[in-house]
Every structure is written in structure tokens, then in C-alpha cells.
Amino acid sequence: MRPATELAVRIGRELLKVSGSSRAARIWSPLIEQSLHGLGFRHSISPSLVARVIDPFLLNHHSLALGFFNWAAQQPGYSHDSISYHSIFKSLSLSRQFSAMDALFKQVKSNKILLDSSVYRSLIDTLVLGRKAQSAFWVLEEAFSTGQEIHPDVCNRLLAGLTSDGCYDYAQKLFVKMRHKGVSLNTLGFGVYIGWFCRSSETNQLLRLVDEVKKANLNINGSIIALLILHSLCKCSREMDAFYILEELRNIDCKPDFMAYRVIAEAFVVTGNLYERQVVLKKKRKLGVAPRSSDYRAFILDLISAKRLTEAKEVAEVIVSGKFPMDNDILDALIGSVSAVDPDSAVEFLVYMVSTGKLPAIRTLSKLSKNLCRHDKSDHLIKAYELLSSKGYFSELQSYSLMISFLCKAGRVRESYTALQEMKKEGLAPDVSLYNALIEACCKAEMIRPAKKLWDEMFVEGCKMNLTTYNVLIRKLSEEGEAEESLRLFDKMLERGIEPDETIYMSLIEGLCKETKIEAAMEVFRKCMERDHKTVTRRVLSEFVLNLCSNGHSGEASQLLREREHLEHTGAHVVLLKCVADAKEVEIGIRHMQWIKEVSPSLVHTISSDLLASFCSSSDPDSILPFIRAIENT
């Protein structure tokens, strides 16, 4: 390994190690800066080294990446260049940190740093996909002003994005600039743009523009452009204009296909212009060309890839409504992507797919189900599952698991249970995750008895419960005042060798304290101390103290904390003192602090400082001043 690469690896690993647990968000801190100084590499820092550290080590930790980037800029004699900016923009792009990207780009402009064209391309694409097309426009302007060549596909995606996002003034400026600079237009960019432009333009102006663009850009698909224009005109009640330009479009190499003719014919049905409809249908038979499915396939995939989902949906609706052929993978892509913005249309695409004798891929159904749940469309979810069930779609473990888990997420408990029973009739054994999902759905719906019944069913079926099973049930039973039942489950899980987690201890203790079963709560806490990590015990202890005080047992909480092993847990002492202050139980607090002073005087200052800090953030700090003074007097 080369020395520069070795150093980048050392720095990257050190940053990840010092910044904390991989589960938590990694935040830049003075401790990290101190650690970097200890590595002693400041004399050899360079933009390429910064880039090697950020990519790959910090790509998924934007805060850490930005902290390291800014720290490097402060080192004597160092300045960033295109390479280091590329790496930080890449990290920020992955986590969609658009504000930070905008601030950095302003820095680039003010410092007159010349970025590589690949950095501009990446920035523009990221911003367009993040629906920040206006910001992307200014990035492109900067790239053009520095003489950079930006690939036409990037410019076309931006043109489509500006138009689709409603930034029409910017779209028009970009369109003019692309033509002026000789940047070629393609079907995606020009198609989305002309679909908007034709809504308010005169037909002569429209045809003249299309003719000029088509002659200069032979790669543009004329039939697709014709469909987009005619569809847009009909949408804004200009079906007569659409009718009159049919022949003109043919003359400028934009031959309307059968779908284009059908769009106008259907618009005339709506307006009652039946004579004109007949004329259009005759023209269709005489002059229309069959739509090339491969062309529309490529166009729809381009729209989906560019996240122009509304436009993709509208083109697909024209195809579906006319029962024109569409490949299965295109329907899969449409159902999965369009469901994010228009779940109703996505379900209609599914209905169309099934009517043609095709069925969706499991990943497509998963995306559709997820988005239906996100949009709170449980009725649509049921409709989709019933349709697929009638075609024998649910026949193996994976598809049944998907259906049941999403029915549970949608809160459709009865339908979930019915599906579970059907699954068992098919000879398929539900696994513990399915039972857990259904039990949790029952608990959320306040259906405790069915949840218990499912527990019994798991036992009969020989399905082994896991931590999640116990967690869900113990938490709910504790909430519902069934502490004895939750304790029974707790004992069973210990017998079966399943280690409780922090949530289980806290749920049990909270439920037992509410029911004034203090000794039982103490016993649960002792088991926590025997079995668990000190950090967990400390958090559970603080929660235990809070629950004791909340239920009128401040004296017992103070007594609990007087056990030697809890003395150093200062956070729990602060919880107690804050609770007794709020409850105006000053004497308990004073006696507790006197005891601490007797057994460990050094802790008094720490606890007092923490207590005062917690009161400073209180909504009514004045109310506890007498308590603080009384504590100080101890």
C-alpha cells in the first residue's frame, strides 16, 4: 500500500473510532480534533489526502465529513481544490444535505475555485433529483461561466426538472441558452418542456419552434413529441387546436401515432364533438402509425430515472386507457415508482397489469404496499391483495409474509389474521416475525385478548418466541394494568434463556409502580443489576426513580438510592431531587443530600451543579429557588 493511501486509511479509521458507536450519528467534536493532532500528519495534508479520507470512510457520515473538511481548511498553508470539493459534495449528496451543499458552493464561487466538470455534473443531478432544480440551474450557470462543458443529458434532465417543478422562467432561460450554445436537446428534456410550452402558446408559434428544434436535433422522437403536445392541448381544453395541427405535425416529422389520435378522439367525446371525433378516427385509420413500444419503453424509463413521475404516469395512462401493449418490467417500474406520488394511479396500473395476464414482481408489490401504507390507503391495499389473491399470487412464504406484514402496518388486524390462517391451510408455517407483527398490530388496536390468543397459538404451533414477542406483550400488558401477567411472561422468558432488554425492564417497572407493587418492581430491578451492563442499569435506575416519585413513593426512591452500588449514579440522584422539588417535598430532598454529604462529600458539588443546570431549563425556575437554597444549606 502506498504511503498516502496508508495515511488516509489511518485517518479514516481513527475518525470512525473516536467519533463513537456505529449505530449513533457521528458528530464532529473537539475530541476528534485533538485525536487528529495526535496523528501528526498536518505537515503532509493535501486535497487528495482529504478526498481519500472522505471517500470512502466518511461518505455515509456527512457531519464527520464536513467537520474534517472544515478542519483541513484551517490548517496552515492548506487550501481545498476540485478533488477535495468533489469528495465532500459526494458525501453531502448521499445524505441530501442541500443547505450545506448550497453554502459550500457559495464558498466555491467566492474563492473562485475551478471545479472539474464531473463535480458540476454530479451536483446538478443530485439537486434535480432532490427537487432543487432552481439551485441546479445556478450551478449550471456557474459551470458555463467558467467555460466547462456539461454533458447534454445533464442539461436535458435539468430542463425537464425545471419544467416539471414549475420553475417555468428558469426553464425558458435554460432552453434558450441550450439552443444558443448548441447543446443538443433530447426527447426527455424537450418533451417535458414542450408539454408545458404548448399550453399557452399560439399554434403557429408552437409549430415553428418544434420544426426548428426537430431539424437541429434529429435524435428527438417525433411521435412522442406529437403525443405530448396533443395530450397537453387536450388537457387544457384546446382539443380543437390539437385537431387542427394533426396534419402540420406530420409535415414537420412528428408523425402522430394511434395513441395521439385516440387522445383527441376521447377529448371530443367529453366535449360532445362527435362529428370531429369521427373525422379523427378516419384520419387515424388512414394516416396513423402504430406506436413503437420500444420507443415509449425507453421514454418512460428515462422519466422514471429522472424522477419525473407525474409525467411518466400521464404517458402510461394514455397507453393503458387505449389498451396498447406495455412490457411487464415497465409496468413493474411504474407501479413501484408512481405509488410514491399517486397511489391511486399505481393501483390502476396494477389492475391493468393483472387484466393482461401478468403479475407484479415481489419487490414491486413491496414498494406499492409501503407507499399505500405511507399514504394511509389501507382500502387500496386490501383491493390490491384481493385482486392478486384471486389470481393465485400468494402461494409461498415470501408473498404471504409481505401481505401479512403490510396489513399489520396498515392496522388491518382482522384481514391479517385471515391471511395467516389461509397461509397455514396452504401448509406454510408462519415464522416468529409474522406472529410478532400481528401481535403488535393487535396491541396497537387495543385488542389484548386476540394478542394473547396469538401467543397461545404460537405455543401450540411450536413457534419459538423471541425478544420482540416478549417486548411487545410485556409493554402492552404493563400499560393496561396487567402487571401480574407481564411478570409471568418476564419469568417465562428468563426460564427460556431470553435476555430482557432495557425496554422490558422499564415497562415492567413502570407498570408495577403504577399498581403500587413496589417490592415486585425492586425484584425486577435487582435482576436487571445481576444480568445487565452498567449503562443499561444506570438508565433503568433513573427511570425507576422517576416512576417511584411519579406515583407518590419519593421516600422509597431515596431509600433505593442509598444502596452503595447506586451512589455513583449521579443522574438518578438528580432525578429524585428534581421530582421532590416539583412535588414540594423539600424535607426528603434535604435528608437525601445530607446523607450524600455524609457518605461521599465529593459528590455534593457534582449533583448540585447538575441539579441547578436542569432547573435552568425549567419552565418555572423561580418555584424551586427555595429548594435550592435549602439544599445549599446542607
Curated annotation (Swiss-Prot):
This is Pentatricopeptide repeat-containing protein At5g14080. The keyword Metal-binding does not apply. It comes from the Eukaryota. NCBIfam families: PPR. InterPro entries: Pentatricopeptide_rpt, TPR-like_helical_dom_sf. The keyword Repeat applies. Keywords: Repeat. Pfam families: PPR (PF01535), PPR_1 (PF12854), PPR_2 (PF13041). PPR repeats lie at residues 81-115, 116-150, 151-185, 186-220, 222-256, 257-291, 292-326, 327-360, 361-395, 396-430, 431-465, 466-500, 501-535. Belongs to the PPR family. P subfamily. It comes from Arabidopsis thaliana (Mouse-ear cress). GO terms for cellular component: chloroplast.
